[in-house]
Amino acid sequence: MKIARVFPRKTSMSPTDALAFFGPPTIENIADCIKENVTEVHISVTFTWDIEKAEDLYYAWQILGVPVEVGGPAFDDRMGDFTPGLYLRDGMIFTSRGCTKDCWFCSVPRCAHGEIKELPIVDGWNILDDNILGTSEAHFRAVCDMLKRQKHRSVFTGGLEPALLQQWQADLLYEVKPARLYTAYDTRDDLEPLIEMGKKLRAAGFRPSSHTMCCYVLCGYDGDSFEDAEKRLVQTMQAGFVPYAMLFRGEDGKYDPEWRRFQREWCRPIITGKKFNEYWLAQNDT
């Protein structure tokens, strides 16, 4: 069975093989599918604001005359098995599904129901798990062992939950020598765990100057202000993490242009890295 995968938009995590397509079918796309004897078309939708576009793609790809299916995270399809390279670029992997938390701004709880499902561990270097620190000790150790074998330095893009990090996990992460690991500062309750996480990671051997420790900072939601958001971003630097502003977007994907401008000042690596370096240099001078 050969599956053509279709995506409403192309991202840095999209697969790059010959049967990964973006948008409506072109004559060349159709020819490629016929040549490869494609038997199914899967339209994968990550963002809810792309659902309408996916509906158009569903009808457009009927031209191949093979079954067309629509699914993906936008439809709360998050707890299934994982096949490397199918819907994500090679190297991007899930080793578990689900999360134990129930964050108001996140769609994962709708399908995870507070549970984490451990998956067979496959080779890869970019860990996308929603809550890998919530997996069993045996699973976490096995994932780290796998990462040590990879030629590419690992990245924990899915994020590490500050409140769950234990010192042995921090020590093991340091042994893996990741290029970057990400955590999140989403609500006020996250600050103290974030500070403690920074202490544990530094105790393990991580240094702020390496820019390995990174943190997504949610901003732009109802009731937020530029002053409060900037305060959280500074607090993130104080905890030892390079901050990256993450703009809140509702089900329709809309956002305030003013917040978008604010986010840009705090999401580009060159800018945030410079702000972070200036902050830590000032701290060392005092």
Region roles according to the model:
Residues E175-V176, R180-Y182, D189-T286:
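A structural motif corresponding to the C-terminal lobe/cap of the Radical SAM core domain
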Residues P24-C33, L165-L173, F226-R232:
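Short, acidic/polar
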Residues R5, E40-T48, S107-L201, S210-D222, ...:
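Core AdoMet radical
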Residues L64-D77:
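Short beta-strand elements of ligand-binding domains
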Residues L57, K117-E118, D228-R232:
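Short alpha-helix in the alpha/beta-hydrolase fold that links the catalytic acid
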Residues D76-T83, G253-E258:
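Glycine-rich, charge-decorated loop segments at or immediately adjacent to ligand/cofactor-binding or catalytic sites
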Residues M1-P67:
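A short, structured N-terminal alpha-helical element that caps or precedes a catalytic domain
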Residues M1-T11, T83-H113, V122-L133:
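N-terminal pre-triad scaffold of radical SAM enzymes
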